[in-house]
């Protein structure tokens, strides 16, 4: 039986001193590819942030792997985040460095010291995302699609148990969006659990099998056969 990698039971999340997502229940199994949907302002980003410890869970039980988010102390949050690959909406890349040195910075910041092991891991992850040829380019010289591939590569560096992506194709053209989704699909096939927040209906139809919808401070599950445009915007 597949274990539950993410398990939220009767969870209430605090956002700006207010309760939100009251009595939420959902789980994600190891190896799943799950889409998080809902209209703008429905709380998708906040729910994702609760998974990696940025938003506070004040009631219920919430586990990510062997981490109890309800009892997680501040000094353990960096340890949790090394187990999670996060694809931010605003990229957070260092524009004065090339792609390779951006990735070196991440590994050194998370405790890697051996130069050869760092090089080996970076080369491996660049190949997984098909951007080996970009390693010496400044991030400021990259296209939007290339930047997003670098961000995915960065998320893979510490071999995370789950990758969380918040609107990873939001600012990309349709062709680049498909390239990004194909990369995430390939990563998932190779064993990584993926959770993607998006409102792109065409991508949902093409790539999705399991859908969680944020609505009225709660989560509901939608089967693919019932997926409609109204599910996303209402």
Label for each model-derived stretch:
Residues 138-142, 146:
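Conserved ABC ATPase signature
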Residues 67-68, 104, 116-134:
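Conserved ABC ATPase "signature" region
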Residues 163-166:
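Catalytic Walker B motif of ABC-type/P-loop ATPase nucleotide-binding domains
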Residues 60-68:
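Conserved ABC transporter NBD signature motif
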């Amino acid at each position: 039986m597949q274990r539950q990698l993410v398990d939220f039971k009767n969870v209430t999340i605090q956002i700006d001193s207010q309760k939100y997502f009251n009595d939420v229940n959902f789980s994600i199994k190891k190896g799943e590819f799950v889409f998080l949907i809902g209209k703008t302002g429905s709380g998708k980003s906040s729910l994702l942030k609760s998974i990696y410890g940025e938003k506070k869970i004040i009631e219920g039980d919430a586990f990510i792997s062997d981490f109890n988010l309800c009892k997680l102390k501040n000094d353990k949050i960096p340890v949790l985040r090394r187990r999670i690959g996060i694809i931010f909406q605003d990229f957070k890349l260092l524009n004065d460095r090339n792609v390779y040195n951006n990735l070196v910075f991440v590994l050194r910041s998370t405790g890697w010291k051996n130069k050869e092991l760092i090089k080996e891991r970076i080369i491996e992850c660049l190949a997984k995302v098909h951007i080996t040829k970009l390693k010496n380019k400044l991030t400021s010289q990259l296209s939007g699609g290339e930047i997003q591939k670098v961000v995915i590569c960065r998320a893979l560096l510490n071999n995370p148990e789950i990758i969380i992506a918040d609107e990873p194709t939001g600012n990309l053209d349709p062709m680049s969006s498909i390239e990004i989704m194909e990369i995430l699909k390939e990563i998932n096939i190779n064993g990584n659990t993926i959770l993607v927040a998006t409102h792109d209906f065409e991508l949902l139809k093409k790539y999705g099998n399991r859908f969680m919808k944020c609505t009225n401070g709660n989560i509901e599950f939608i089967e693919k056969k019932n997926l409609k445009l109204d599910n996303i915007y209402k």
